Amino acid sequence: MQVDLEPLNGKSILVLCSGAGGIPFWLAERTTQGHILGVELDDDLLGAARLSAEEKGLSHLVEFRKAEKTRLAFPDNMFDRLISEFIIFPTPTPTEIGQPEMARVLKPGGKMVITDVIVTKPISPEVRKELNAIGLDYLCEGTAGDFRSWMQEAGLTDIEVKDFTPLVKAVWERRRNQDASPVHRTGYSLLLEDASLKLGEGTFYIYVRGTKPAT
């Protein structure tokens, strides 16, 4: 991610669904100037992030604000970088903000990075509940091709969509082997064995990047 966002120093960076601040703090460790703004819907996570910023002595670099569900309350062309990350630091309260709205607040030449967990077909509330039980709190219905199309429709260029499901699958397999709870068996079975839903067949971890044209 860092390579696709460089340079970071002195940049204005927006982090969507910033949770307890994992990504903003990660960015702050890699820059000495600029402004990193995280927006989050969950009040408890927002409060925790603000407290952590003070404790870490990063309030001069990092700010956290309450998010809105369907829009970004910022002017056009405001940020140099935008990150929407749902894999390493997922939030239980995602927004419903699409790529066009994200692109709107990016400056010309600005860079966008999105990570997501996707299912390629609709799943029932019962299946979603079983996956939630093992820690898969958020799933986006769509395909890698959909994400590419959405980025293109938002006017972004230099688009790349990467599938890194095989790397994450090994992590889930280790978790299953270490988890003795019988209530989690169905969730692991769905994610790792179900013919239509399992990782690499119906569920994927993707990384998406794009750039807003400079002119």
Q: How should each PLM-predicted stretch be described?
A:
Residues 160-215:
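Conserved Class I S-adenosyl-L-methionine
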Residues 12-15, 19-71:
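Class I SAM-dependent methyltransferase SAM/SAH-binding core
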Residues 80-94:
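A short SAM/SAH-binding and catalytic strip from SAM-dependent methyltransferases
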Residues 96-111:
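A short glycine-rich, Lys/Arg-flanked "PGG" loop and its adjoining helix->strand segment in the class I
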Residues 139-155:
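Short alpha-helix
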Residues 70-82:
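A short acidic, Gly/Pro-enriched loop at the edge of an enzyme's catalytic core
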Residues 1-11, 26:
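Conserved alpha-helix/loop element of class I SAM-dependent methyltransferases that forms part
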Residues 117-138:
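Short, glycine-/aromatic-enriched active-site segment of Class I SAM-dependent methyltransferases
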